[in-house]
């Protein structure tokens, strides 16, 4: 029996929204009108707003709604915040609101940014030694940086830009593999497009200069640029937060005496430090709240998730992101994570609810 190969659709992206829905209805739903009705019901009645949503992604045929919630009473560094949250998971907003209310009368949360360096890499193969590559980069550093002037001009005005270029020898891991590691300060933006644009410009300039570099020509050395891209691993973009209270203030919780509750809570945190089964679930709970505010503020929650989970493996094993300590009758919960976020750029300037979220946080 001859096997019938599935037919590939060509030019799907060029179809109108109506044509895409016709295709979906015909191929998957046997020409049912129900699918069109569902998709139409989730369109925005305001055509201008719908056009904004359509512009975010490709092949859009409708909107997928999630609840937009508020969690008040977050006292952070002695300022009272109302936190906008976007999540479909029940109990997340309730848990956050209860935690905020509990800690409000106990000094709230203390938080600080410890560092804010973001990093991108030019990945390349080079058939010479590190010193030859290092000399080439040092001799041409000014020209390499100058290639980004048009891109970095506005960022420099906001206090950001490129802060360092380092050569990393990775040949022990992969033959001829070197990295140029470039540090960035992206001010108040997440900076993904900015970083990638800078890396692309620098790569082109390096490729151009390397082909004219006398020593490389005479020695038979050549640089082959494999890719240029930012890294979502941001161990130098760190935020720390904590909350603490007297153990005696841990009252009316689960019907347990305050000292016993503190000990059980600390032990639960300690388990998440040593057992990966618990650590993954523990950290998922942390990300429930972080993801919700990232989505509400138009940030790339997938990038932040990737960076945070890699940070959880910093000690060569996956463990809890937060910890609990008991000292001098004080109960303290703390967390330190990489958090690369922005308040400008991306959909921040486009999505009306993202703008609203930032206004709520800034009030």
Where on the chain are the PLM-derived regions?
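Mobile "lid/hinge" segments at catalytic clefts and subdomain interfaces of large enzymes
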Residues: 85, 92-112, 361-363
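A structural-propensity feature for long, helix-poor, extended segments
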Residues: 106-142, 312-363
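Glycine-rich anion/phosphate-binding loop at the beta-strand->alpha-helix junction
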Residues: 197-207, 214-349
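Hydrophobic alpha-helical scaffolding
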Residues: 43-47, 60, 85-86, 127-130, ...
């Amino acid at each position: 029996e001859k096997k019938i190969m599935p037919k590939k659709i060509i030019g799907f992206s060029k179809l109108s929204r109506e044509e895409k829905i016709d295709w979906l209805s015909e191929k998957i739903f046997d020409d049912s009108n129900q699918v069109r009705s569902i998709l139409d019901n989730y369109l925005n009645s305001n055509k201008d707003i719908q056009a904004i949503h359509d512009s975010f992604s490709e092949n859009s045929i409708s909107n997928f709604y999630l609840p937009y919630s508020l969690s008040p009473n977050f006292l952070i560094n002695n300022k009272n915040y109302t936190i906008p949250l976007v999540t479909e998971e029940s109990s997340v907003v309730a848990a956050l609101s209860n935690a905020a209310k509990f800690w409000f009368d106990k000094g709230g949360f203390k938080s600080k940014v410890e560092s804010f360096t973001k990093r991108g890499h030019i990945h390349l193969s080079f058939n010479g030694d590190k010193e030859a590559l290092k000399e080439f980069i040092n001799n041409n550093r000014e020209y390499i940086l100058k290639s980004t002037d048009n891109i970095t001009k506005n960022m420099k005005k906001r206090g950001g830009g490129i802060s360092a270029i380092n050569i990393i020898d990775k040949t022990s891991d992969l033959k001829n593999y070197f990295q140029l590691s470039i540090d960035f300060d992206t001010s108040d933006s997440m900076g993904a497009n900015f970083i990638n644009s800078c890396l692309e410009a620098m790569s082109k300039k390096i490729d151009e200069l390397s082909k004219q570099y006398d020593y490389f020509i005479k020695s038979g050395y050549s640089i082959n640029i494999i890719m240029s891209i930012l890294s979502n691993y941001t161990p130098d973009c760190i935020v720390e937060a904590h909350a603490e209270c007297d153990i005696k203030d841990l009252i009316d919780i689960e019907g347990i005496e305050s000292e016993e509750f503190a000990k059980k809570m600390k032990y639960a945190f300690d388990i998440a430090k040593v057992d990966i089964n618990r650590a993954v679930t523990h950290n998922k709970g942390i990300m429930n709240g972080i993801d919700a505010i990232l989505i509400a503020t138009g940030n790339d929650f997938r990038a932040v998730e990737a960076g945070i989970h890699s940070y959880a493996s910093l000690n060569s094993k996956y463990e809890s992101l937060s910890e609990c300590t008991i000292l001098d009758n004080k109960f303290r919960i703390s967390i330190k994570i990489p958090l690369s976020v922005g308040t400008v750029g991306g959909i921040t300037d486009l999505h009306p609810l993202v703008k609203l979220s930032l206004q709520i946080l800034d009030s």
